[in-house]
Amino acid sequence: MNGTTDRAAAVEVALPVGRVQGSSIGGVRRFLGVPYAAPVSGSGRFAAPQPVEGWEGVRDATVAGPTSPQPDRSRFGSLDVSPFFAPGWVRGDDHLTVNIWAPDSADGTAPVLVFVHGGGFIAGSASAPAYDGAAFARDGVVFVGVNYRLGAPGFLAVPGAPDNRGILDVIQALRWVRENIAAFGGDPATVTLAGQSAGAVIVASVLCDPDAEGLAHRAIMQSGTGAGAFTPEQGEIVASAFAAELGIDLTVDALGAVSDDALVEASRVLSGVDVATGSARAPIGDIVRFAPIHPRRPADTIADSWGGGIELLIGTNLDEAGLYLAPTGQLDGAVDPVAAAGRFVEGAERLVQAYRDEFPDAGDAGLTRTITGDGMFGAGSRRFADRHMSAGGTTHVYEFTWRPDSVHGLLGASHLMELPFVFDMDAEMEGLRGAGTLLGTALPPTDLASRLHGAWVAFVCGYGPGWSAYTAEAKLVQSIGDEWELRPGHRVALYDAWERA
Protein backbone atom coordinates (compact mmCIF):
# COMPACT_ATOMS: atom_id res chain seq x y z
CA MET A 1 0.00 0.00 0.00
CA ASN A 2 1.35 3.31 -1.09
CA GLY A 3 1.74 6.95 -0.12
CA THR A 4 3.78 9.99 -1.27
CA THR A 5 5.56 12.92 0.37
CA ASP A 6 6.23 15.06 -2.75
CA ARG A 7 5.30 18.76 -2.83
CA ALA A 8 2.27 19.95 -4.83
CA ALA A 9 2.33 22.28 -7.84
CA ALA A 10 -0.65 24.24 -9.21
CA VAL A 11 -2.24 23.09 -12.48
CA GLU A 12 -5.19 24.48 -14.44
CA VAL A 13 -7.72 22.94 -16.82
CA ALA A 14 -10.13 24.84 -19.08
CA LEU A 15 -13.71 23.53 -19.22
CA PRO A 16 -16.63 24.89 -21.29
CA VAL A 17 -18.12 26.46 -18.13
CA GLY A 18 -14.87 27.90 -16.74
CA ARG A 19 -11.36 27.14 -15.55
CA VAL A 20 -10.44 25.00 -12.54
CA GLN A 21 -7.18 24.96 -10.61
CA GLY A 22 -6.02 21.73 -9.05
CA SER A 23 -2.68 20.42 -7.87
CA SER A 24 -0.03 18.03 -9.13
CA ILE A 25 1.96 15.83 -6.78
CA GLY A 26 3.99 12.69 -7.41
CA GLY A 27 3.03 12.54 -11.08
CA VAL A 28 -0.69 12.77 -10.30
CA ARG A 29 -2.99 15.74 -10.93
CA ARG A 30 -5.86 16.19 -8.48
CA PHE A 31 -9.02 18.29 -8.96
CA LEU A 32 -11.52 18.26 -6.10
CA GLY A 33 -15.09 19.50 -5.86
CA VAL A 34 -15.60 20.08 -9.60
CA PRO A 35 -19.36 20.57 -10.21
CA TYR A 36 -21.18 18.34 -12.68
CA ALA A 37 -24.63 19.77 -11.83
CA ALA A 38 -26.06 22.96 -10.36
CA PRO A 39 -26.37 23.45 -6.58
CA VAL A 40 -29.54 22.09 -4.96
CA SER A 41 -31.62 23.75 -2.24
CA GLY A 42 -35.23 24.08 -1.13
CA SER A 43 -37.65 22.24 -3.41
CA GLY A 44 -34.81 21.82 -5.90
CA ARG A 45 -33.42 19.10 -3.65
CA PHE A 46 -36.26 16.92 -4.97
CA ALA A 47 -35.88 17.76 -8.67
CA ALA A 48 -33.77 16.19 -11.40
CA PRO A 49 -30.17 17.49 -11.56
CA GLN A 50 -29.73 20.65 -13.60
CA PRO A 51 -26.76 21.73 -15.77
CA VAL A 52 -23.87 23.65 -14.27
CA GLU A 53 -23.83 27.40 -14.81
CA GLY A 54 -20.54 28.95 -15.85
CA TRP A 55 -18.26 31.01 -13.61
CA GLU A 56 -15.79 33.83 -14.08
CA GLY A 57 -12.13 33.47 -13.29
CA VAL A 58 -10.54 30.29 -11.95
CA ARG A 59 -12.40 27.98 -9.58
CA ASP A 60 -10.33 26.50 -6.75
CA ALA A 61 -10.30 22.70 -6.99
CA THR A 62 -7.50 22.03 -4.54
CA VAL A 63 -9.79 21.33 -1.56
CA ALA A 64 -12.81 19.04 -1.49
CA GLY A 65 -16.08 20.94 -1.20
CA PRO A 66 -19.46 20.29 0.43
CA THR A 67 -20.97 16.82 0.77
CA SER A 68 -24.55 15.63 0.78
CA PRO A 69 -26.43 16.12 4.09
CA GLN A 70 -25.98 12.98 6.20
CA PRO A 71 -25.78 11.60 9.73
CA ASP A 72 -22.48 10.61 11.33
CA ARG A 73 -21.34 7.14 10.29
CA SER A 74 -17.78 7.15 11.58
CA ARG A 75 -18.37 4.03 13.69
CA PHE A 76 -20.24 0.75 13.49
CA GLY A 77 -20.56 -0.16 17.15
CA SER A 78 -17.04 -0.71 18.46
CA LEU A 79 -15.45 -0.44 15.00
CA ASP A 80 -13.83 2.70 13.59
CA VAL A 81 -14.93 3.06 9.95
CA SER A 82 -13.98 6.74 9.60
CA PRO A 83 -11.70 6.16 6.57
CA PHE A 84 -14.85 5.30 4.61
CA PHE A 85 -17.18 8.00 5.98
CA ALA A 86 -15.06 11.03 6.91
CA PRO A 87 -15.41 13.97 6.58
CA GLY A 88 -19.14 13.37 7.03
CA TRP A 89 -21.48 16.25 6.30
CA VAL A 90 -19.62 19.30 4.98
CA ARG A 91 -22.37 21.88 4.62
CA GLY A 92 -23.17 23.63 1.37
CA ASP A 93 -25.67 23.39 -1.49
CA ASP A 94 -22.97 22.85 -4.12
CA HIS A 95 -22.33 19.18 -3.41
CA LEU A 96 -23.11 17.59 -6.79
CA THR A 97 -19.43 17.40 -7.63
CA VAL A 98 -16.69 15.03 -8.72
CA ASN A 99 -13.16 14.50 -7.44
CA ILE A 100 -10.64 13.64 -10.16
CA TRP A 101 -7.19 12.08 -10.05
CA ALA A 102 -5.34 11.92 -13.38
CA PRO A 103 -1.81 11.01 -14.46
CA ASP A 104 0.33 14.03 -15.33
CA SER A 105 1.10 12.23 -18.58
CA ALA A 106 -2.53 11.55 -19.58
CA ASP A 107 -3.11 12.77 -23.15
CA GLY A 108 -6.78 12.06 -23.79
CA THR A 109 -6.37 8.32 -24.27
CA ALA A 110 -6.25 7.18 -20.62
CA PRO A 111 -9.00 4.80 -19.48
CA VAL A 112 -11.49 6.30 -17.03
CA LEU A 113 -12.84 4.78 -13.80
CA VAL A 114 -15.96 6.45 -12.38
CA PHE A 115 -16.51 5.28 -8.78
CA VAL A 116 -19.77 5.54 -6.80
CA HIS A 117 -19.29 5.31 -3.03
CA GLY A 118 -21.43 3.27 -0.66
CA GLY A 119 -23.06 4.18 2.64
CA GLY A 120 -26.58 2.74 2.63
CA PHE A 121 -27.94 5.60 0.48
CA ILE A 122 -27.67 7.85 3.53
CA ALA A 123 -23.98 8.48 4.25
CA GLY A 124 -20.56 8.74 2.64
CA SER A 125 -18.90 10.89 0.01
CA ALA A 126 -16.27 10.86 -2.70
CA SER A 127 -14.08 12.85 -0.29
CA ALA A 128 -13.59 9.97 2.17
CA PRO A 129 -9.90 9.11 2.64
CA ALA A 130 -10.59 5.55 1.46
CA TYR A 131 -11.57 6.79 -2.01
CA ASP A 132 -8.35 8.62 -2.85
CA GLY A 133 -7.79 7.74 -6.51
CA ALA A 134 -4.06 8.49 -6.64
CA ALA A 135 -3.04 4.83 -6.89
CA PHE A 136 -5.22 4.40 -9.98
CA ALA A 137 -3.77 7.55 -11.53
CA ARG A 138 -0.22 6.35 -10.88
CA ASP A 139 -1.16 3.28 -12.90
CA GLY A 140 -2.43 5.28 -15.86
CA VAL A 141 -6.15 5.55 -15.06
CA VAL A 142 -8.18 8.76 -14.74
CA PHE A 143 -10.20 8.23 -11.56
CA VAL A 144 -13.48 10.10 -10.96
CA GLY A 145 -15.26 9.91 -7.59
CA VAL A 146 -18.90 11.02 -7.60
CA ASN A 147 -20.89 12.80 -4.91
CA TYR A 148 -24.64 12.27 -5.22
CA ARG A 149 -27.74 13.11 -3.21
CA LEU A 150 -28.35 10.88 -0.20
CA GLY A 151 -31.30 10.21 2.10
CA ALA A 152 -34.64 11.82 1.37
CA PRO A 153 -33.41 14.22 -1.34
CA GLY A 154 -31.81 11.31 -3.17
CA PHE A 155 -34.21 8.42 -2.71
CA LEU A 156 -37.51 9.24 -0.98
CA ALA A 157 -40.57 8.60 -3.17
CA VAL A 158 -42.33 11.96 -3.47
CA PRO A 159 -45.44 12.52 -5.63
CA GLY A 160 -44.62 14.93 -8.43
CA ALA A 161 -40.86 14.40 -8.15
CA PRO A 162 -38.73 11.96 -10.15
CA ASP A 163 -37.81 8.78 -8.30
CA ASN A 164 -34.21 7.77 -7.67
CA ARG A 165 -32.77 11.28 -7.85
CA GLY A 166 -29.45 10.04 -6.50
CA ILE A 167 -29.20 7.72 -9.49
CA LEU A 168 -30.13 10.57 -11.83
CA ASP A 169 -27.19 12.46 -10.29
CA VAL A 170 -24.80 9.65 -11.21
CA ILE A 171 -26.15 9.53 -14.76
CA GLN A 172 -25.66 13.29 -14.99
CA ALA A 173 -22.09 12.83 -13.74
CA LEU A 174 -21.50 10.25 -16.48
CA ARG A 175 -22.78 12.74 -19.07
CA TRP A 176 -20.37 15.30 -17.61
CA VAL A 177 -17.54 12.78 -17.94
CA ARG A 178 -18.43 12.16 -21.59
CA GLU A 179 -18.25 15.88 -22.35
CA ASN A 180 -15.34 16.95 -20.13
CA ILE A 181 -13.00 14.13 -19.15
CA ALA A 182 -10.76 14.57 -22.20
CA ALA A 183 -9.64 17.88 -20.69
CA PHE A 184 -8.17 15.86 -17.81
CA GLY A 185 -6.52 13.34 -20.15
CA GLY A 186 -9.22 10.67 -20.08
CA ASP A 187 -10.83 8.82 -22.98
CA PRO A 188 -14.64 9.24 -22.91
CA ALA A 189 -14.95 6.10 -25.05
CA THR A 190 -13.26 3.93 -22.38
CA VAL A 191 -15.28 4.48 -19.20
CA THR A 192 -15.74 1.89 -16.46
CA LEU A 193 -18.54 2.56 -13.96
CA ALA A 194 -17.81 1.04 -10.56
CA GLY A 195 -19.43 1.10 -7.15
CA GLN A 196 -19.39 -0.60 -3.78
CA SER A 197 -22.44 -1.46 -1.62
CA ALA A 198 -25.06 1.24 -2.27
CA GLY A 199 -22.76 2.43 -5.04
CA ALA A 200 -22.91 -1.01 -6.66
CA VAL A 201 -26.70 -0.92 -6.45
CA ILE A 202 -26.59 2.40 -8.29
CA VAL A 203 -24.32 0.84 -10.92
CA ALA A 204 -26.84 -1.99 -11.42
CA SER A 205 -29.62 0.57 -11.76
CA VAL A 206 -27.68 2.62 -14.31
CA LEU A 207 -26.97 -0.49 -16.40
CA CYS A 208 -30.74 -1.02 -16.66
CA ASP A 209 -31.62 2.60 -17.45
CA PRO A 210 -32.05 3.28 -21.19
CA ASP A 211 -31.17 6.95 -20.66
CA ALA A 212 -27.66 5.89 -19.61
CA GLU A 213 -26.90 3.70 -22.62
CA GLY A 214 -23.44 4.33 -24.00
CA LEU A 215 -22.22 6.34 -21.01
CA ALA A 216 -20.15 3.42 -19.65
CA HIS A 217 -18.39 0.59 -21.42
CA ARG A 218 -17.52 -1.74 -18.53
CA ALA A 219 -18.84 -2.07 -14.98
CA ILE A 220 -17.67 -3.22 -11.56
CA MET A 221 -20.15 -4.13 -8.81
CA GLN A 222 -18.65 -4.76 -5.36
CA SER A 223 -21.08 -6.09 -2.74
CA GLY A 224 -24.37 -4.82 -4.11
CA THR A 225 -26.87 -5.46 -6.91
CA GLY A 226 -30.25 -3.94 -6.08
CA ALA A 227 -31.76 -7.15 -4.74
CA GLY A 228 -33.15 -5.02 -1.90
CA ALA A 229 -34.64 -2.35 -4.14
CA PHE A 230 -38.09 -1.14 -3.17
CA THR A 231 -41.17 -1.72 -5.25
CA PRO A 232 -43.25 1.44 -5.77
CA GLU A 233 -45.60 0.20 -3.04
CA GLN A 234 -42.73 -0.25 -0.57
CA GLY A 235 -41.40 3.18 -1.47
CA GLU A 236 -44.79 4.65 -0.57
CA ILE A 237 -44.71 2.93 2.85
CA VAL A 238 -41.31 4.44 3.64
CA ALA A 239 -42.32 7.88 2.33
CA SER A 240 -45.51 7.91 4.41
CA ALA A 241 -43.56 7.01 7.55
CA PHE A 242 -41.05 9.75 6.79
CA ALA A 243 -43.72 12.44 6.27
CA ALA A 244 -45.53 11.33 9.42
CA GLU A 245 -42.32 11.70 11.43
CA LEU A 246 -41.98 15.26 10.13
CA GLY A 247 -45.68 16.00 10.61
CA ILE A 248 -46.09 17.31 7.04
CA ASP A 249 -47.91 16.42 3.85
CA LEU A 250 -45.93 14.32 1.42
CA THR A 251 -45.44 16.99 -1.25
CA VAL A 252 -42.46 18.62 -2.91
CA ASP A 253 -43.42 22.03 -1.52
CA ALA A 254 -43.79 20.75 2.04
CA LEU A 255 -40.50 18.86 1.93
CA GLY A 256 -38.80 21.80 0.25
CA ALA A 257 -39.56 23.92 3.30
CA VAL A 258 -37.90 21.43 5.69
CA SER A 259 -34.29 22.08 6.67
CA ASP A 260 -31.48 19.71 5.79
CA ASP A 261 -30.96 19.05 9.50
CA ALA A 262 -34.59 18.02 9.97
CA LEU A 263 -34.48 15.74 6.93
CA VAL A 264 -31.38 14.00 8.25
CA GLU A 265 -32.84 13.61 11.74
CA ALA A 266 -36.17 12.26 10.46
CA SER A 267 -34.40 9.58 8.46
CA ARG A 268 -33.41 7.82 11.66
CA VAL A 269 -36.98 6.61 12.25
CA LEU A 270 -36.85 4.60 9.03
CA SER A 271 -34.17 2.20 10.28
CA GLY A 272 -36.89 0.05 11.83
CA VAL A 273 -39.64 0.34 9.21
CA ASP A 274 -40.76 -3.00 7.79
CA VAL A 275 -41.33 -2.21 4.12
CA ALA A 276 -43.81 -5.08 3.82
CA THR A 277 -46.18 -3.83 6.52
CA GLY A 278 -45.08 -0.37 7.63
CA SER A 279 -44.73 -1.62 11.21
CA ALA A 280 -41.62 -1.43 13.37
CA ARG A 281 -39.00 -4.16 13.06
CA ALA A 282 -35.53 -4.51 14.52
CA PRO A 283 -33.08 -3.54 11.77
CA ILE A 284 -29.92 -5.42 10.84
CA GLY A 285 -27.05 -3.31 12.09
CA ASP A 286 -29.22 -0.17 12.30
CA ILE A 287 -29.41 0.10 8.51
CA VAL A 288 -31.55 3.04 7.44
CA ARG A 289 -34.24 2.12 4.98
CA PHE A 290 -33.59 4.07 1.81
CA ALA A 291 -33.21 2.25 -1.49
CA PRO A 292 -33.83 2.80 -5.18
CA ILE A 293 -37.39 2.23 -6.37
CA HIS A 294 -37.83 -0.24 -9.22
CA PRO A 295 -40.98 -2.07 -10.38
CA ARG A 296 -38.61 -4.96 -11.21
CA ARG A 297 -35.23 -5.46 -9.60
CA PRO A 298 -32.11 -4.95 -11.73
CA ALA A 299 -31.27 -8.67 -11.79
CA ASP A 300 -34.66 -9.28 -13.41
CA THR A 301 -34.17 -6.61 -16.08
CA ILE A 302 -30.44 -6.75 -16.88
CA ALA A 303 -30.95 -9.38 -19.61
CA ASP A 304 -33.16 -6.96 -21.55
CA SER A 305 -31.02 -3.88 -20.85
CA TRP A 306 -28.03 -2.29 -22.54
CA GLY A 307 -25.87 -3.24 -19.55
CA GLY A 308 -26.39 -6.92 -20.28
CA GLY A 309 -23.97 -6.67 -23.17
CA ILE A 310 -20.97 -5.02 -21.51
CA GLU A 311 -18.11 -6.59 -19.57
CA LEU A 312 -18.84 -6.93 -15.85
CA LEU A 313 -16.68 -7.64 -12.79
CA ILE A 314 -18.89 -8.58 -9.85
CA GLY A 315 -18.46 -10.16 -6.43
CA THR A 316 -18.86 -10.09 -2.68
CA ASN A 317 -16.93 -10.79 0.50
CA LEU A 318 -17.15 -14.10 2.35
CA ASP A 319 -18.46 -12.63 5.62
CA GLU A 320 -20.30 -9.48 4.48
CA ALA A 321 -22.57 -9.24 7.52
CA GLY A 322 -19.68 -9.29 9.96
CA LEU A 323 -19.58 -5.48 9.70
CA TYR A 324 -23.16 -5.14 10.91
CA LEU A 325 -23.23 -7.96 13.48
CA ALA A 326 -19.81 -8.30 15.13
CA PRO A 327 -19.06 -4.70 16.28
CA THR A 328 -22.61 -4.31 17.63
CA GLY A 329 -22.39 -7.44 19.79
CA GLN A 330 -24.97 -9.39 17.80
CA LEU A 331 -22.63 -12.39 17.48
CA ASP A 332 -21.86 -12.52 21.21
CA GLY A 333 -23.45 -15.30 23.24
CA ALA A 334 -26.28 -17.42 21.85
CA VAL A 335 -27.26 -16.71 18.24
CA ASP A 336 -29.83 -18.44 16.05
CA PRO A 337 -28.98 -19.00 12.39
CA VAL A 338 -32.55 -20.11 11.66
CA ALA A 339 -33.84 -16.75 12.87
CA ALA A 340 -31.22 -15.03 10.72
CA ALA A 341 -32.32 -16.96 7.64
CA GLY A 342 -35.95 -16.24 8.47
CA ARG A 343 -35.36 -12.54 7.85
CA PHE A 344 -34.95 -13.34 4.16
CA VAL A 345 -36.82 -16.56 3.27
CA GLU A 346 -39.73 -18.71 4.42
CA GLY A 347 -37.83 -22.00 4.18
CA ALA A 348 -35.30 -20.98 6.83
CA GLU A 349 -34.63 -24.41 8.34
CA ARG A 350 -33.92 -26.00 4.94
CA LEU A 351 -31.59 -23.15 4.06
CA VAL A 352 -29.67 -23.40 7.34
CA GLN A 353 -29.23 -27.14 6.83
CA ALA A 354 -27.69 -26.44 3.43
CA TYR A 355 -25.18 -24.14 5.15
CA ARG A 356 -24.43 -26.73 7.84
CA ASP A 357 -23.71 -29.25 5.08
CA GLU A 358 -21.42 -26.76 3.30
CA PHE A 359 -19.64 -25.57 6.49
CA PRO A 360 -19.71 -28.55 8.90
CA ASP A 361 -17.14 -26.99 11.25
CA ALA A 362 -18.88 -23.61 11.58
CA GLY A 363 -20.62 -22.68 14.81
CA ASP A 364 -23.89 -20.80 15.09
CA ALA A 365 -22.17 -17.40 15.13
CA GLY A 366 -20.26 -18.16 11.95
CA LEU A 367 -23.34 -19.55 10.22
CA THR A 368 -25.40 -16.52 11.24
CA ARG A 369 -22.74 -14.18 9.89
CA THR A 370 -22.47 -16.03 6.57
CA ILE A 371 -26.22 -16.53 6.05
CA THR A 372 -27.01 -12.91 6.85
CA GLY A 373 -24.27 -11.72 4.51
CA ASP A 374 -25.48 -13.93 1.70
CA GLY A 375 -29.05 -12.75 2.27
CA MET A 376 -27.97 -9.13 2.11
CA PHE A 377 -25.39 -9.41 -0.69
CA GLY A 378 -24.13 -12.81 -1.80
CA ALA A 379 -27.24 -14.48 -3.19
CA GLY A 380 -28.30 -11.36 -5.08
CA SER A 381 -24.82 -10.88 -6.51
CA ARG A 382 -24.66 -14.42 -7.84
CA ARG A 383 -28.16 -14.09 -9.29
CA PHE A 384 -27.13 -10.89 -11.09
CA ALA A 385 -24.00 -12.61 -12.41
CA ASP A 386 -26.08 -15.49 -13.75
CA ARG A 387 -28.55 -13.16 -15.48
CA HIS A 388 -25.80 -10.98 -16.93
CA MET A 389 -23.91 -14.01 -18.21
CA SER A 390 -27.10 -15.38 -19.79
CA ALA A 391 -27.65 -12.05 -21.56
CA GLY A 392 -24.39 -12.49 -23.44
CA GLY A 393 -22.13 -10.11 -21.56
CA THR A 394 -18.69 -11.20 -20.39
CA THR A 395 -18.89 -11.75 -16.64
CA HIS A 396 -16.07 -12.16 -14.11
CA VAL A 397 -16.92 -13.20 -10.53
CA TYR A 398 -14.81 -12.93 -7.37
CA GLU A 399 -15.14 -13.68 -3.66
CA PHE A 400 -12.88 -11.83 -1.22
CA THR A 401 -11.90 -14.10 1.68
CA TRP A 402 -9.08 -12.52 3.71
CA ARG A 403 -10.02 -12.36 7.40
CA PRO A 404 -8.37 -9.95 9.87
CA ASP A 405 -8.30 -10.44 13.63
CA SER A 406 -10.73 -7.53 14.21
CA VAL A 407 -13.51 -7.75 16.84
CA HIS A 408 -11.93 -10.85 18.40
CA GLY A 409 -11.89 -12.55 15.01
CA LEU A 410 -15.66 -12.26 14.57
CA LEU A 411 -15.57 -9.55 11.89
CA GLY A 412 -14.32 -11.88 9.17
CA ALA A 413 -14.01 -10.93 5.52
CA SER A 414 -16.71 -8.36 6.07
CA HIS A 415 -18.39 -5.66 4.06
CA LEU A 416 -15.83 -2.94 3.14
CA MET A 417 -12.90 -5.31 3.63
CA GLU A 418 -11.76 -5.41 -0.01
CA LEU A 419 -11.73 -1.63 -0.44
CA PRO A 420 -8.34 -0.83 1.15
CA PHE A 421 -6.73 -3.34 -1.20
CA VAL A 422 -8.64 -2.27 -4.32
CA PHE A 423 -7.50 1.32 -3.71
CA ASP A 424 -3.99 0.26 -2.62
CA MET A 425 -4.47 2.48 0.41
CA ASP A 426 -1.74 3.70 2.72
CA ALA A 427 -1.58 1.08 5.48
CA GLU A 428 -0.72 3.80 8.00
CA MET A 429 -3.89 5.81 7.32
CA GLU A 430 -5.52 6.85 10.58
CA GLY A 431 -8.38 4.54 11.53
CA LEU A 432 -7.48 1.79 9.07
CA ARG A 433 -5.15 -0.51 11.01
CA GLY A 434 -4.82 -1.28 14.71
CA ALA A 435 -7.10 -2.28 17.55
CA GLY A 436 -10.73 -1.33 16.88
CA THR A 437 -10.23 -0.81 13.14
CA LEU A 438 -11.34 -2.69 10.04
CA LEU A 439 -7.97 -4.29 9.29
CA GLY A 440 -7.07 -4.95 12.92
CA THR A 441 -3.53 -5.86 13.88
CA ALA A 442 -2.91 -8.97 11.77
CA LEU A 443 -0.92 -8.42 8.59
CA PRO A 444 -2.49 -9.44 5.27
CA PRO A 445 -0.43 -11.18 2.58
CA THR A 446 2.23 -8.74 1.41
CA ASP A 447 1.07 -8.85 -2.21
CA LEU A 448 -2.70 -8.72 -1.61
CA ALA A 449 -3.05 -4.98 -2.29
CA SER A 450 -0.82 -4.97 -5.36
CA ARG A 451 -2.54 -8.01 -6.88
CA LEU A 452 -6.11 -6.91 -6.18
CA HIS A 453 -5.53 -3.30 -7.22
CA GLY A 454 -3.71 -4.59 -10.29
CA ALA A 455 -6.68 -6.77 -11.24
CA TRP A 456 -9.01 -3.76 -11.10
CA VAL A 457 -6.58 -1.65 -13.17
CA ALA A 458 -6.25 -4.41 -15.78
CA PHE A 459 -10.03 -4.69 -16.04
CA VAL A 460 -10.45 -0.93 -16.46
CA CYS A 461 -7.77 -0.96 -19.17
CA GLY A 462 -9.65 -3.64 -21.11
CA TYR A 463 -7.47 -6.66 -20.37
CA GLY A 464 -9.84 -8.47 -18.00
CA PRO A 465 -9.07 -8.95 -14.29
CA GLY A 466 -6.66 -11.84 -14.84
CA TRP A 467 -8.98 -14.83 -14.45
CA SER A 468 -11.35 -16.65 -16.77
CA ALA A 469 -14.94 -15.58 -17.32
CA TYR A 470 -17.96 -16.98 -15.52
CA THR A 471 -19.92 -19.17 -17.94
CA ALA A 472 -22.86 -21.57 -17.83
CA GLU A 473 -20.48 -24.48 -18.44
CA ALA A 474 -17.89 -23.48 -15.82
CA LYS A 475 -19.15 -21.09 -13.16
CA LEU A 476 -15.67 -19.93 -12.24
CA VAL A 477 -15.24 -17.79 -9.12
CA GLN A 478 -11.89 -16.23 -8.22
CA SER A 479 -11.27 -16.62 -4.49
CA ILE A 480 -9.06 -13.74 -3.27
CA GLY A 481 -7.36 -13.84 0.11
CA ASP A 482 -4.44 -15.65 1.71
CA GLU A 483 -4.47 -17.74 -1.45
CA TRP A 484 -5.81 -16.97 -4.93
CA GLU A 485 -7.76 -19.89 -6.32
CA LEU A 486 -10.09 -20.11 -9.32
CA ARG A 487 -12.95 -22.29 -8.16
CA PRO A 488 -15.40 -23.89 -10.60
CA GLY A 489 -18.99 -24.11 -9.35
CA HIS A 490 -18.04 -22.38 -6.10
CA ARG A 491 -21.03 -22.34 -3.69
CA VAL A 492 -23.48 -23.04 -6.52
CA ALA A 493 -25.41 -25.49 -4.31
CA LEU A 494 -25.85 -22.85 -1.60
CA TYR A 495 -27.11 -20.18 -3.97
CA ASP A 496 -29.44 -22.72 -5.57
CA ALA A 497 -30.78 -23.32 -2.06
CA TRP A 498 -31.59 -19.60 -1.81
CA GLU A 499 -33.57 -19.82 -5.04
CA ARG A 500 -35.58 -22.75 -3.64
CA ALA A 501 -36.11 -21.33 -0.12
Walk through the language-model features, giving the residues of each.
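Non-catalytic accessory segments of hydrolases
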Residues: 1-164, 431-452, 458-466, 494-501
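Substrate-access "cap/lid" subdomains that shape
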Residues: 179, 213, 222-340, 368-373, ...
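Serine-hydrolase-like catalytic core of hydrolytic proteins
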Residues: 33, 79-252, 302-324, 463
